[in-house]
Amino acid sequence: MKVSIIGAGMVGSSIAYATMIKGVAREISIVDINGDLAEGQALDLSHGAPYVHPVRIKGGNDYSLTKNSDVVVITAGRAQKPGETRLQLLKSNAKIISSIVESCLKYSENPIILMVSNPVDVLTWVAWKKSGLPRERIIGSGTTLDTARLRQNIADHCKLDPRSVHAYIIGEHGDSEIASWSTANVGGVPIKEFCNGCLAKGCERDKVFERIFENTRDAAYKIIEKKGATYYGIGLAVARILETIAGDHHSVLTVSSVHEEFRGMRDVPFSVPSVLGKKGIERILPLKLSDDELKGLENSAKVIKAAIESILENREPRAENPR
């Protein structure tokens, strides 16, 4: 599989590094407006190939490097300038994404486009509108990382292997995201039943759930406060998405996609558990949510829809989670 990564910053290079270690791609191209940076990242990574898996890595600022890509991963975008409104930034990044999609499609006929740039749900919609590709081939990294954070936080509290925890963050990758506690389980045991043993020891389950969710939702803010940016976690999350596409694994991941209809809203992107394979999103799983969770998901979808409409109507969107 050939993977092209647009954006050679810390997120893009972390994705390339994780993808290389997993042996997911036979060829990786890194493209950035700063051609020297992209070339340097590619050269640095290529020197580690003898210790992992055979892979050809190239970098530069020419989109011809993306020719015949199976998957195009987009991490590019720009930061907010002093005095710039969120709408101005969002519209600017939407133009950047549109330009990237147009450039990539000149060299690859029917790639899967994997959006990582934030706000990921809105920009997934932008890529879908610009590309003209089927919905199933436009994927956002969505809440894949948020879901991993939730599972790790549950595992830390319960002293478990996080791979044995099955819980999902759904909706927006941002402050309106929700945890689907009603579907969460440990080894097939519903999470609330699993926690019954702790209740006898004085554990206040609902307060623990609330704290775990808040730590999950606000994780990016804490990381950015400590080190300035997040990139390793999202690098591994995106490499996992690429792995299931390359191997046609039909794994279930909480990626973002543009839903044709949801509770009266058309063409709204958000994350729910989805089956991924070589064609992209093979199917979307119907979650049995509680009434409160369904209301939360509906609210999250409305938040995303409002951000999309703000681009079209020149209205100021609300803030979103940085990563």
UniProtKB/Swiss-Prot annotation:
The keyword Phosphoprotein applies. Belongs to the LDH/MDH superfamily. LDH family. Substrate binds at residues 80, 86, 118-121, 146-149, 230. The modification Phosphotyrosine is found at residue 221. Allosterically activated by fructose 1,6-bisphosphate (FBP). Beta-D-fructose 1,6-bisphosphate binds at residues 151, 166. The gene is ldh. It catalyses: (S)-lactate + NAD(+) = pyruvate + NADH + H(+). Homotetramer. Pathway: Fermentation; pyruvate fermentation to lactate; (S)-lactate from pyruvate: step 1/1. GO terms for cellular component: cytoplasm. Keywords: Allosteric enzyme, Cytoplasm, NAD, Oxidoreductase, Phosphoprotein. It is an enzyme of class 1 (oxidoreductase). Its EC number is 1.1.1.27. InterPro entries: L-lactate/malate_DH, L-lactate_DH, L-lactate_DH_AS, Lactate/malate_DH_C, Lactate/malate_DH_N, Lactate_DH/Glyco_Ohase_4_C, NAD(P)-bd_dom_sf. The active site is at 173 (proton acceptor). It is found in: Cytoplasm. One of its GO terms (biological process) is lactate metabolic process. This is L-lactate dehydrogenase. One of its GO terms (molecular function) is L-lactate dehydrogenase activity. Catalyzes the conversion of lactate to pyruvate. NAD(+) binds at residues 11, 32, 63, 99, 116-118, 141. Pfam families: Ldh_1_C, Ldh_1_N. It comes from the Bacteria. It comes from Kosmotoga olearia (strain ATCC BAA-1733 / DSM 21960 / TBF 19.5.1).
